C-alpha cells in the first residue's frame, strides 16, 4: 500500500511543479498574449531609450565641443609677478616671526637659483 500512495504523491507534486513553471515563464504562451507593436509604439520606444545608448565617440565629441567651465571669478584682479613674489616673501617672513627661529635668507636667494 505504501508504494501506490508514494507514487500518487510524487505525481501530484510533479504536476504542481510543472504547472507552476509553465505559468511563471515570461514569454507569452498563446498567440492572443503576444504584443502587437505598432510603428508609432516602436518609434516611441526608440526615442525613449535612444539617448541612453550614445556611442563613446559622440560623447567625447560633445564634451570637446563644450566650452570649459569657468573655474575662477572673472572679477578677480590678477597679481603681477613682482607683487606675487612680495606677497610670498612677506608670508615667509611672517611665518619666521611666528616661529621665532633664526632663518638664513641667503639660502633662498642663492646664485644657482637664478642661473636657469
Curated annotation (Swiss-Prot):
Presence of keyword Signal: yes
Main location group: secreted
Pfam families noted in UniProt: Spexin
One GO term of the biological process aspect: positive regulation of systemic arterial blood pressure
Expression induction: Down-regulated in omental and subcutaneous fat of obese animals.
Highest taxon of source: Eukaryota
GO molecular function, one term: type 2 galanin receptor binding
Propiece residue ranges: 27-35, 50-116, 74-116
One term under GO cellular component: dense core granule
Region described as Disordered: 52-77
Signal peptide: 1-26
Role description: Plays a role as a central modulator of cardiovascular and renal function and nociception. Also plays a role in energy metabolism and storage. Inhibits adrenocortical cell proliferation with minor stimulation on corticosteroid release.
Annotated family: Belongs to the spexin family.
Protein known as: Spexin
Organism encoding this protein: Mus musculus
Gene: Spx
Amino acid at each position: 500500500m505504501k508504494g501506490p500512495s508514494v507514487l500518487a504523491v510524487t505525481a501530484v507534486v510533479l504536476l504542481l511543479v510543472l504547472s507552476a513553471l509553465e505559468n511563471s515563464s515570461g514569454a507569452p504562451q498563446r498567440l492572443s498574449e503576444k504584443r502587437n507593436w505598432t510603428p508609432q509604439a516602436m518609434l516611441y520606444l526608440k526615442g525613449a531609450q535612444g539617448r541612453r545608448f550614445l556611442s563613446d565617440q559622440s560623447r567625447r565629441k560633445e564634451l570637446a565641443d563644450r566650452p570649459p567651465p569657468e573655474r575662477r571669478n572673472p572679477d578677480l584682479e590678477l597679481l603681477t609677478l613682482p607683487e606675487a613674489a612680495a606677497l610670498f616673501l612677506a608670508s615667509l617672513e611672517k611665518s619666521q616671526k611666528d616661529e621665532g627661529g633664526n632663518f638664513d635668507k641667503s639660502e633662498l636667494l642663492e646664485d644657482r637659483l637664478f642661473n636657469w
